[in-house]
Amino acid sequence: MMLEHVLVLSAYLFSVGLYGLITSRNMVRALMCLELILNAVNINFVTFSDFFDSRQLKGSIFSIFVIAIAAAEAAIGLAIVSSIYRNRKSTRINQSNLLNK
């Protein structure tokens, strides 16, 4: 596959994730959009690593680290969302101000 096709795909995923993150009112949807952004970045890492220096695996290794951090972020984020849902009975971002009530 050519470099331009992969970069267009990555830019599309990044823009969809960014749009969803900005317009989302649900915390779970915002976490999913954040994961979409991180996956677009991983595609860029692997693509540029393969395109510019295919003998070294720096982009792939860095991508694995980003995946591990994203998994930890998703676990912590979902734990926070479930805690807020138990207390507030809602996962809407504008209703999750914990300083009220």
Curated annotation (Swiss-Prot):
One GO BP: photosynthesis, light reaction
Presence of the UniProt keyword Chloroplast in the record: yes
Catalytic activity line of the entry: a plastoquinone + NADH + (n+1) H(+)(in) = a plastoquinol + NAD(+) + n H(+)(out); a plastoquinone + NADPH + (n+1) H(+)(in) = a plastoquinol + NADP(+) + n H(+)(out)
Class in the EC hierarchy, top level: translocase
Localization per Swiss-Prot or TrEMBL: Plastid, Chloroplast thylakoid membrane
Any GO molecular function: oxidoreductase activity, acting on NAD(P)H, quinone or similar compound as acceptor
Keyword Transmembrane helix appears in the UniProt entry: yes
EC number(s) on file: 7.1.1.-
Cellular component GO terms, alphabetical: chloroplast thylakoid membrane; NADH dehydrogenase complex
TM stretches of this protein: 2-22, 32-52, 61-81
Membrane-topology descriptor: Multi-pass membrane protein
Any Pfam family the entry gives: Oxidored_q2
Alphabetical keyword list: Chloroplast, Membrane, NAD, NADP, Plastid, Plastoquinone, Quinone, Thylakoid, Translocase, Transmembrane, Transmembrane helix, Transport
Domain of life: Eukaryota
Entry-linked InterPro entries: NADH_UbQ_OxRdtase_chain4L/K, NUOK/Mnh_C1-like
Primary site of residence: plastid
Assigned protein family: Belongs to the complex I subunit 4L family.
Record's function text: NDH shuttles electrons from NAD(P)H:plastoquinone, via FMN and iron-sulfur (Fe-S) centers, to quinones in the photosynthetic chain and possibly in a chloroplast respiratory chain. The immediate electron acceptor for the enzyme in this species is believed to be plastoquinone. Couples the redox reaction to proton translocation, and thus conserves the redox energy in a proton gradient.
Oligomeric form and interacting partners: NDH is composed of at least 16 different subunits, 5 of which are encoded in the nucleus.
Protein name per UniProt: NAD(P)H-quinone oxidoreductase subunit 4L, chloroplastic
